[in-house]
Amino acid sequence: MDKTPSEITPAPETALMQCDVLVMGGGPAGSTCATLLAEKGFQVIMVEKEQHPRFHIGESLLPANMPLLERLGVAEEIKKIGMLKLGIEFNSPDHEHTSLIEFSESWNKDLSWAYQVRRSEFDEI
């Protein structure tokens, strides 16, 4: 259950913090952005209101994510927790129409696979 502003305990000391970049959100996008900026030498502060890992519906990674995960040095960890995904299928609400897309048939033939992961495990990495 989320706390209301009056229930949040402030930090014992308030200090003026300076940075080059303030990243709001520590999920996959925010933490990746903060990591890449810090690698470039920027002073980064990342702010996240939630506690991680937390329950969240699964994360459906796309093939274009794979090179970035390699660059971040976490590809092997993702492989251990992920279920290999070679494509996606879309179904209409009435299930009368479907569309199957195989990643190997997409615009970049080199990016032919991805993973489906549990978000809580993904957040830990």
Please state what every model-predicted region is.
Residues 54-95:
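N-terminal FAD cofactor-binding segment of flavoenzymes
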Residues 22, 38-59:
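Glycine-rich FAD pyrophosphate-binding loop
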Residues 92-125:
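Conserved N-terminal helical subregion
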Residues 2-8:
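Short gly/ser/thr-rich secondary-structure transition/capping motifs
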Residues 32:
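Conserved SAM/SAH-binding loop-helix junction
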Residues 12-29, 45:
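Beta1/beta-strand and adjacent pyrophosphate-binding region of the FAD-binding site
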